[in-house]
Amino acid sequence: MSVTYVASCKLPTPFGVFDMHGFQEVGTQKEHIALTLGDIGDGASVLARTHSECLTGDALFSMRCDCGYQLDEALRSIAAEGRGILLYLRQEGRGIGLLNKIRAYNLQDQGADTVEANEQLGFAADMRDYSMCKPMLYHLGISRIRLMTNNPRKVDSLTKLGIEVVERVPLEVGRNPHNRNYLATKAGKLGHLLTTHQDDDYVVAAK
């Protein structure tokens, strides 16, 4: 996939002042961003997160998933390290889009799990594409990453694209009674590497 670099700016956040870089896919015109901190183009491996858009979790504080919590923790971790990158990819709902995600949530309210809901709507369990990541990283001078993820399939996808993932850094945050079944399905059906917890009834404090 080809992407075009558009522009950069400073982005002050509660975690520090990041540089925000805008990219656009050639053909689809879909927009993606990269948030960077520190010297990332020195050839050393960079702490990284590829984060697919989740309006409900990232902006509306939904507890149905762990996305918003992972976004916060990834930015905190990058800030603590003093350097790193977060690729924010516009592929809502594991690639099915926001309105279809709402339809999938409705099916989950009726008893389907997150994979079954996608399949009942005629979609694959995970329709995300990471091919835009390599040219974005290349533009920013990054060739080796330490990837914050619980998803080994994401590691495999990036590796097949020619991105050197030197380490998988677990990112287990945000577990609560509302997403207990969702996380269990991600582990059982999507292969995510998640720890078994004894505190299922623990309610995560509001962010």
From Swiss-Prot:
GO terms for biological process: riboflavin biosynthetic process. Zn(2+) binds at C54, C65, C67. GO terms for cellular component: cytosol. Disulfide bonds: none annotated. Gene3D superfamilies: GTP cyclohydrolase II (3.40.50.10990). GO terms for molecular function: GTP binding; GTP cyclohydrolase II activity; zinc ion binding. Its cofactor is Zn(2+). InterPro entries: GTP_cyclohydro_II (IPR032677), RibA (IPR000926), RibA-like_sf (IPR036144). This is GTP cyclohydrolase-2.
